[in-house]
């Protein structure tokens, strides 16, 4: 089983999601119990909805617990260097159109928390890893092949875009 890189903030948010899901267990169990009391389960929409919710919730809990066991928590403040790696914020310019893009490379489980991030395991992330400013990189995207020039690399940590 290979490890999965994640920032300290991403790890904290995943642990918080797990904690919140576990807190919902009694509520879902109570909804199932109350629906059972209504009688015939074959035509009991409330019962089936509560069981479905319970199944999805337990699947997500199992997924997160499995991932947490594999996480390699990375201190974003300790990152740096001249080459693109986990935690780098990269500015790119489309060689053809001149359009500029900015991405932060993070682990696959935290890109949803961080606006402007891509997974290091995505086609974009994999194409950028190990490159330096001035390098050109070809990335396959849904619209085809796009060539970018790497303009700059920064290691400032992710801008987690979440409200708590």
Enumerate the language-model features and the residues they cover:
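Short, exposed beta-strand "edge-strand" segments with a Pro/Gly-rich flavor and a Y/T-containing core
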Residues: 1-6, 71, 116, 121
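Generic detector of short, locally flexible boundary/turn motifs and exposed helical patches
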Residues: 13-14, 20-21, 53-59, 68-70, ...
């Amino acid at each position: 089983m290979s490890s999965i890189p994640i920032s300290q903030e991403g790890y904290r948010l995943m642990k918080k999601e797990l904690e919140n899901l576990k807190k919902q267990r009694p509520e879902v169990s109570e909804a199932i119990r109350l629906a059972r009391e209504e009688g015939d389960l074959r035509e009991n929409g409330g019962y089936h909805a509560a069981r479905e919710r319970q199944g999805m919730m337990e699947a997500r809990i199992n997924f997160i617990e499995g991932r947490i066991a594999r996480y390699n928590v990375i201190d974003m403040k300790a990152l740096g260097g001249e080459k693109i790696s986990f935690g780098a914020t990269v500015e790119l310019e489309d060689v053809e159109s001149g359009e500029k893009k900015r991405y932060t490379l993070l682990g696959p489980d935290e890109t949803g928390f961080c606006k402007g991030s891509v997974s290091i395991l995505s086609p974009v992330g994999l194409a950028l890893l190990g490159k330096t400013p001035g390098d050109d990189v070809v990335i396959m995207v849904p619209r085809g092949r796009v060539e970018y020039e790497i303009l700059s690399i920064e290691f400032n940590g992710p801008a987690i875009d979440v409200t708590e």
